Amino acid sequence: MGVHPIIRRRGRTAIAACCVALVALVSPAIAGTRTSSSYHLTTHLGLKKVRDSAGPQQIRILHLSPGKNVPDIAPATQQYPMWALTSSMSARAGAIAGINGDFGTSRGQPKHTLMIDGELWTTGQSGGDAVAWSANGKTAYIGHPSLKILAKDRDRTDAFFVQGWNRGAPNGGSIQGYTTRGGTVTQPPGKVNPQATDPHFCAARLTPTAPVGWNGKARTSIVRQYKVEAQPSPCPKTPLGFNGENDAVVVAAEAATPAAGKITGLRVGDKIRLSFTFKGWRNVTDVMGASEMLVKKGNNIAPGYNPGDNYILNYNPRTAVGITKGCSDVDTTTKCRLIFITIDGRQGSTGWSKGVRLPNLAKQLIRAGAYRAVNLDGGGSTSMWSKKRNPTFCESTPSVGGCLVQRPSQSNGERATRSAIVVMPSGDAGTPRGLR
């Protein structure tokens, strides 16, 4: 009897050892095998191609260390509505790589905040988060953009905030700003042929008198000087146009609101200073709006999916951008890297790539080194383009040249979007001199 426990113990030990061996053999198949290849597109830009058999998933990662190569934003067109392919926007900009940008509306507007080379295009149609960077790309931020637009009448020591920019008609007592970027979609309020029931709007047209620049060494606000060129009185029902001035700004408020007094208080010839301030984001010249935060201070904060949730939280192709801790800390010895990632999806049945939910996307970004990260447009919009062609990483070759390094989910290829984040080969020539 005394011997049997020892024998049984050995048996258990042997069985346990056998089980461990089996787990060691089986676990990779359960967890998925991950294979990767890395390529140098330039000295500062690398491409990593990853296949994870769990899913399966096809992942593409661009690592940018800003230096000679810098990030920039390429718009689909110069005015709304905006529609173009990521490959076309990237190639037209003279970029060496690019990914699709923010979500958009059915009317061809960016959905969230968009600033390009120091010019605010829109405050967006809804809230959201954003990625932002300096002209040289060595400072970057990700989070919720806290933007203040202040108009100061330097002749009358009066000031007012502008609540929206190329967003829509004034409502709720707000003052809205408009530029020619709004195109045929977002225009100054009013009706060309108004009816008796249409509201009156008070508006003023401002034209620039000086180049754009910073508010000083702190570089916390982008500023520009204007003069009041027109301020119709009494406030009409018809819109105030730009009078052929591409750089003109129209500010407007509904006549029946207290905000109208700020507009009617302006006089033709008054000197106005407009300032654009992203709180806590100094030195920023480019801002790309986005949706959900994925990574914050190195932690995965992506929203999960539960049955009945919006399909956007389920398995989908994905595009996202992340930054390292060195992009926005005060330690000058830490370096900034930007991380652009795409994960193909809706192609699981072919064995190519299933797509991921947002927590898995965040996991991949953290693995790639992201300290903060945010979700961009995905689904059929997900695209990553490279100017350099290499048969080992190219998946298709668009007519504009270069290649797509991933496979769009739509059978007809890329889907048109509103903008792209691109990597420029030698600085950002589009940034005005006063903001460099």
Regions found by a protein language model. Give the residues of each.
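Secretory targeting and sorting signals
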Residues: 2-31
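Gly/Ser/Thr/Pro-rich low-complexity, intrinsically disordered segments
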Residues: 12, 30-436
